[in-house]
Amino acid sequence: MNTLFNTVNFWRYNSSPLTQFEIKDLISIDTPILGNLHISITNIGFYLTMGAFFLLIINLLSTNYNKLIGNSWSISQESLYATLHSIVVNQINPKNGQIYFPFIYALFIFILINNLIGMVPYSFASTSHFVLTFALSFTIVLGATILGFQKHGLEFFSLLVPAGCPLGLLPLLVLIEFISYLARNISLGLRLAANILSGHMLLHILAGFTYNIMTSGIIFFFLGLIPLAFIIAFSGLELGIAFIQAQVFVVLTSGYIKDALDLH
């Protein structure tokens, strides 16, 4: 009876699909002695730390310890490693791809783990927050820009000049290319957060709708099995999106690094 009451209260006070994305303090400490210093652990910080902890556990489980035959964890991680390595090397080039692959691999695992954690019911989707994804995208684009200037100097601005551009259209096209280059900061982070955010909101709306149907009577309970099956299928689709968005993020990152290195 208490469980049912708590469930009813949950859907009553969490009717908004945006409630699940609120950043809240899990633990907070106020220290007036140090000048009203507020120390807190938020839900996004907690789940990001949990993601790092899970990553450590997965790496320990996938370690072969010099065994000839690896376990299922090591085989899956090696397959993922080989797939990403092929993508990065083909996207950049065999030489520079080896240099930047560790960073891109760590970035992929970080995004993927946090995407999957967000799929767990009553957890927190860290990658649905624009503050996190924009921090990643701005840092990556800024780093690629610094890399380009470090290698090419002022010649890096030739990236903004399209090949075979007529002289009369040069100012306009350079302006368009410059705006397009700046838009990378927004588009890279926006794509990831928007896909995760929209998927979780839709699942929340469908779950609330299904719950209201199934608690309206015995007949409606069986009718609610239809949208419940759709929710289960859509959850499987969201798992696929979690992998796809992580892959898209690192593919675009590899492309930005390639542009900075090769100026095209």
UniProtKB/Swiss-Prot annotation:
InterPro entries: ATP_synth_F0_asu (IPR000568), ATP_synth_F0_asu_AS (IPR023011), ATP_synth_F0_asu_bact/mt (IPR045083), F0_ATP_A_sf (IPR035908). Keywords: ATP synthesis, CF(0), Hydrogen ion transport, Ion transport, Membrane, Mitochondrion, Mitochondrion inner membrane, Transmembrane, Transmembrane helix, Transport. GO terms for cellular component: mitochondrial inner membrane; proton-transporting ATP synthase complex. The chain crosses the membrane at residues 41-61, 99-119, 129-149, 156-176, 194-214, 217-237, 238-258. The keyword Mitochondrion applies. It comes from the Eukaryota. Its main location: mitochondrion. The keyword Ion transport applies. GO terms for molecular function: proton-transporting ATP synthase activity, rotational mechanism. It is a multi-pass membrane protein. It is found in: Mitochondrion inner membrane. Mitochondrial membrane ATP synthase (F(1)F(0) ATP synthase or Complex V) produces ATP from ADP in the presence of a proton gradient across the membrane which is generated by electron transport complexes of the respiratory chain. F-type ATPases consist of two structural domains, F(1) - containing the extramembraneous catalytic core and F(0) - containing the membrane proton channel, linked together by a central stalk and a peripheral stalk. During catalysis, ATP synthesis in the catalytic domain of F(1) is coupled via a rotary mechanism of the central stalk subunits to proton translocation. Belongs to the ATPase A chain family. This is ATP synthase subunit a. It comes from Podospora anserina (strain S / ATCC MYA-4624 / DSM 980 / FGSC 10383) (Pleurage anserina). The lineage of its organism: Eukaryota, Fungi, Dikarya, Ascomycota, Pezizomycotina.
